[in-house]
Structure formats: structure tokens, C-alpha cells
Amino acid sequence: MKGSKIHDPIVPMPPVQSPYGPPVDKITMRAYQLPGIVSVRFTDLFPEFPQPIYPDRSGNKNIKIIRELAEDRLRRVDMSMIKSNDSINILGSHHGFTLFGDGAPYAEMLKTIRDIIIERTGAKDIRLRVGVGLRHKEADMWIKYFKLDEYFGKGRARGIAPLDPGIPVDTEIGTLYVLRDAFDAKWIVHAHNSDVREVHFHRHIDRAVKPFAMSYARLETRATYHFNFGPRTANIVARAIFESPFVQSKYTFSSFIVPSPEGIVTVDADNNLYALNDRITLHNFRTYGKIMTLYTKLKDFIVVLDFSGPIPYQFAGGVIFANFSSNVDLFDLDVEFPGYTWYSEMFYDELGHPMSPRINPVHPGMKAIVINLAWGGYPSVFWSQQVPTIIVGEHMAEVLRRDSQNREFLRHAVVADDLPTAMEFAYKFAKTDKVIIFDGAAGGINVSKSLAEEMLELAPKVSEEVDNVRIPKWCKQRGMDCEAIKNSEKYKEWYENIKR
């Protein structure tokens, strides 16, 4: 397709074997291999996006660039509080290992943090603690996959889960509970990723602070975030924990791997978490804000899920399926409730209809969902109740059938023998040939030719609308001086003119 804005499909990362997924040898066909599938690239949709470094626009993956950038950023933060005989916990999250289906950049950043702490402070007692949500085995799976247990040393790298022992922390809103083993060192380093991820929950308010109420918190405190508060006010929980005297007495600095919808863009590090948060917020408005706005404008299509992750955490163009489904401007705080959050789900009746006009329905353009590859371990029955769903193969059906969090999924879905059969059925009843594939591809999105043409036609107006109308509103709602952030030295150097 030389000279065209419609390209050959992008080959996604291969399936990852997981205790939560199907046997990978049963995945005999990927969705990008379907007839008629092409890709649309971000260089054509939004050419103003910053150049990715991993993979670059030629598809090259040079992990040394991640280390070089991380070393540069980490040598600029203050580590003077750390003494040579001190203990340090580097706090990570499992989400960092699933960016574009390739956790190598996040793993490299974690290793670099360890190495630079040793270089600058002489401290040797450095541990890695990786938090998870509902899939308690996943963190240890990624630690072994990237050999972080070997890199950090025996017993120094392990997962932490919400049901692990907790300790009380006095905060401005009362006693909350964090994980004991996250905070059992003298110092902590907050090591995370900046993609919008669950923006349907956090609404990009203090996004960089969220792991303090998620990855590092006990179940009781995580539950207040998800169920006691609405999607805009819940972020007070994370801020209260982070600003507590206990956590502040241990906090040193933060280091983030920074993607755009296209690929990894940079690494950011700062002692001031709120300054870092401002930078990633503006960056995400200018990048994720555009592809997410474009998604809300799509009409009549079939979704194919084909990624190593739970159903809500399947990626297309860097955006998870849960956000795609919401079909509203998730950055606009005037929008009260997305169509999907655990909080919103409680407001649907037994027929699957919102009980209040304040609850938005899921994306009306979704006419069918085809599940070729996904993991269990996350409540997902909501989607099979809302959208006609076809599961590819008994191996995939068995994943959901045996999953305690999805016991009723098969009551609302059918099983096809293989992917072509599933697609043939979906085309017939959905009455559309437009397809979008959630497979984590980097650089662009695998879609049908008809949907690629629709996206290319919509993109210029979306870009103008986001730049001139939406971003000023989003910034004002959060009390952010986005022009000052954009003109700051770190933002210009680290996010726009990346030094390699």
C-alpha cells in the first residue's frame, strides 16, 4: 500500500502464557491475519504527536534508549536523603508490563532505578515490590518473565496483593490501610507508567498519585475508591494516603515510563510528584485526548479482542477497551458518570438499561464483540450483557467459564469454532464490515479498510476540536496553567525535543 495512508496490518506482540489465559498454542490465528484487515498509523491520523522512541516509527526496538533516558532523568533528582546503609523499596505496578503488550521498557526503567540508586548513594538494600489488583499471581509472573528476581537478587523482587497484611495510616480523611510490605523499607520510590489506563475511574485527577490507593493499598481502602466514591471524587483517597505523614516520611522521588497512543515517548522523574503529574496530564490531553475523542465519533463497527490481558484492559491505539466502551469525554468533569465503571454498573437494571439519565450507555457503535484472546481475572460479564458477544473456541470459553469473576459470561455469549467463523457470524448480524482490533499494536491501529477511511476523514477536525476547545476546558477544570506547563523547560525537553 505504498504511498497510501492505509497500511498493511501491524504485527502485535505474541500471546503471553498466563495462569489467567488460554494455552497460547491454541491461539492459531490472530485477528490482524483476517482478510481485509489493514492499519491506520498515528503519523497519518495525528502527525503532531511526539516521536516515539520504543518502538520508533521504523518499528525498531532499542532498549538502550530507555536506559539512557532513565539514567539522565534519575541523575537530576535529589537522592541525598538516602544513605548507604538504608533500605529502599521500589514500588511498581503490574500495569507497566502491558504497555503495547511489551513490558521491556518498564522493566528496564525499574532496573535502571536500582542501578542509579546504588551509583549515587552506595545503598545496596534495594527491593522491588510490584502491586496488582484482582489477579494476585500476575506480578510474580511478570517478575519472572523479565528475570527481575535475578536482577534484584534472591527474595528482593516480589509481588504484593490487596489481601496481603496491611498497616493503618492516619490521613486527613481518617484511617486508611496500606500494604505492610510496600512500606517495610526506610524509603520508597514510586515507579509507574503514565498512560491514561483507567481514566473511566480516575478521570485524570491526580492520575500519577492513583497507585497509592490501588497498587500499594489494602483491599478495604481500594474498595472505598471503587464503590464508596463516584468516579470524580474517589481520587481523594490516593491523595490522602500519599500526603499522610507516614508516607511522606518515606517518599523520595517518582520515575515514570511515559507512552503516547503510538509508543513509548520518554521517561520522567521528579521529587515533586505533583509537578510530574501536571506534565503527564497535559501530555495525555494532547495525545490520548485526541484518539479517545475520535473513538467516540465512530459508527457501527465490530470489536475484536485479541490481547494478553483481561477484557477491560485490551488495547487499541494505547486506549483500553473499558475507556473505549464509555463513549463519553472522560476528561470532561462536567460528565458525571461514564457508561462503565464498577460504580456505574450498579445503576443498570436487570435488562441492562441505565436506570438514570445521568448514566451514559456503552458505545452505541459497538454492534458485536468477538473475543479471540483475553484473560480472566476481572469482572467482565457487563460487556456480554450489553453487546452481542462471540467467543472463539472452547479453549477461550473455558477461561471465562472457570473464572469465578465471570461465572455468568457464557449465559450471554455464544462460542464459535474458530476466528473466521466468528467473524462471518458477526458480519451477518452486525450488518457492518467495519472492524477495530484490540491487540496492543504499537504505532497505529489494526482495522478494516472501511473503518480506516472513516478515522482518517474524522481525525483533522478532532485534532482541531481537542486543541482549541477541549484542552482549554480540561485544564481549567483542574486549575492547571497548561501554557506554563507546556513552556516549562522539562516539558519542552523531555516530551517534545527528546534528547537521545
Predicted regions span which residues?
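Divalent-metal (Mg2+/Mn2+/Ca2+)-assisted nucleotide/phosphate chemistry catalytic cores
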Residues: 174-261, 271
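An acidic, phosphate/nucleotide-engaging active-site surface
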Residues: 136-203
